[in-house]
Amino acid sequence: MDWNAIQGILPHRYPFLLVDRVLEVEAGRRAVGQKNVSGNEWYFSGHFPGQPVMPGVLIMEALAQVGAVALLSLPEFQGRLALFGGMDRVRFRRQVVPGDVLRLETEIIKLKGRVGKGYGRAFVGEELAAEGELLFAVGEKIE
């Protein structure tokens, strides 16, 4: 799924759409996405000048966006908004810097009605960069 198709599912737009491609989707179960981390990312000018590092919370947001693609691919949730409700047990294992390609893997581990939990892992190559639980709710239809 390319960037245009992702925008057909998620309402996020530049500069806050943090997923460039979705490589795999199992509706309601899991998705795998990719973020090509460019030296031109808006956040690098201040995080940190001279030693750019992708903020960990934005890695988690990217994982949440990939999870939202899996969730909103279910027929009953199409056209709705996925709301990021929180994070638990988050760990940052490796810095993500310009030139890295992030592989974003998010699994939906619990779904009850329109509320649930996912688990996300972000990799650079085979190296784990970040992981944690993602809490979410599915909102109303987007008009």
From Swiss-Prot:
CDD domains, A to Z: FabZ
GO biological process annotation, one example: lipid A biosynthetic process
Catalytic center residues: H47
Keyword Lipid biosynthesis applies: yes
EC class (word): lyase
Subcellular location: Cytoplasm
InterPro entries according to UniProt: FabA_FabZ, FabZ, HotDog_dom_sf
Gene Ontology MF: a single term: (3R)-hydroxyacyl-[acyl-carrier-protein] dehydratase activity
Keywords of this entry: Cytoplasm, Lipid A biosynthesis, Lipid biosynthesis, Lipid metabolism, Lyase
Catalytic activity as recorded in UniProt: a (3R)-hydroxyacyl-[ACP] = a (2E)-enoyl-[ACP] + H2O
Pfam families: FabA
EC number of the protein: 4.2.1.59
GO annotations of cellular component type: cytoplasm; membrane
Cited PANTHER family: 3-HYDROXYACYL-[ACYL-CARRIER-PROTEIN] DEHYDRATASE
Family statement drawn from the similarity comment of this UniProt entry: Belongs to the thioester dehydratase family. FabZ subfamily.
Function, as annotated: Involved in unsaturated fatty acids biosynthesis. Catalyzes the dehydration of short chain beta-hydroxyacyl-ACPs and long chain saturated and unsaturated beta-hydroxyacyl-ACPs.
Protein's name according to its UniProt entry: 3-hydroxyacyl-[acyl-carrier-protein] dehydratase FabZ
